């Protein structure tokens, strides 16, 4: 079910963000005098995943756009052989 208002959408986005949960966890520890556990904020594999630069994203968008334009006007796709069709 979609959110009924923009406030509800922001609420769902906030509750689903890991950064918000890290912040709440830190505040909770400080308020209750709990020492910070070094293993709770371990780095995840997300840090090591491939992150394309804005230039790479633009280049990919440009390639896909022109390939789509070619197919729209009846020409053969150039990128069709680069993707698996299962």
Swiss-Prot record:
InterPro entries: Mrx7. Keywords: Mitochondrion. Its main location: mitochondrion. It holds the Pfam family Mrx7. One of its GO terms (cellular component) is mitochondrion. It is found in: Mitochondrion. Component of MIOREX complexes, large expressome-like assemblies of ribosomes with factors involved in all the steps of post-transcriptional gene expression. Associates with the mitochondrial ribosome. This is MIOREX complex component 7. The lineage of its organism: Eukaryota, Fungi, Dikarya, Ascomycota, Saccharomycotina.
């Amino acid at each position: 079910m979609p959110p009924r208002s923009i406030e509800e959408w922001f609420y769902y986005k906030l509750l689903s963000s890991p950064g918000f949960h890290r912040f709440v966890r830190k505040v909770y520890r400080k308020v209750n005098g709990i020492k910070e556990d070094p293993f709770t904020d371990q780095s995840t594999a997300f840090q090591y995943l491939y992150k394309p630069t804005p230039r790479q994203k633009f280049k990919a968008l440009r390639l896909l756009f022109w390939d789509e334009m070619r197919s729209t006007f009846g020409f053969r796709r150039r990128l069709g052989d680069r993707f698996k069709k299962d």
